[in-house]
Amino acid sequence: MAKNSMVERDRKRRKLAQKYSAKRERLKAIIESPESSVEERFEAQLKLQQIPRNASPVRQRNRCAKSGRPRGYYRKFGLARNELRRAAMNGEIPGLTLSSW
């Protein structure tokens, strides 16, 4: 089980990223646009710097939905490897069978 503080920190980052995503995209479009003037770009960069760092989607960490484990994460299932194995053994994931030889 992951530390609750780390899981909550990641939840906070996801919430902030969602909140500022539209504003962030607008500012990045102005910065990358060849039609915008130098002053507009500079002003957009300053506004982008005012957005909290945790609002950046890059700072998010994929975590297991059950245990919060950050490593061994399978995107397709949203689970860490050990939770995925446990769920597969119990037959909780349709169509997934563990191989044995």
UniProtKB/Swiss-Prot annotation:
Residues 1-10 have a biased composition (Basic and acidic residues). GO terms for biological process: translation. Keywords: Ribonucleoprotein, Ribosomal protein, RNA-binding, rRNA-binding. Pfam families: Ribosomal_S14. Residues 1-20 are annotated as: Disordered. Part of the 30S ribosomal subunit. Contacts proteins S3 and S10. This is Small ribosomal subunit protein uS14. It comes from Halorhodospira halophila (strain DSM 244 / SL1).
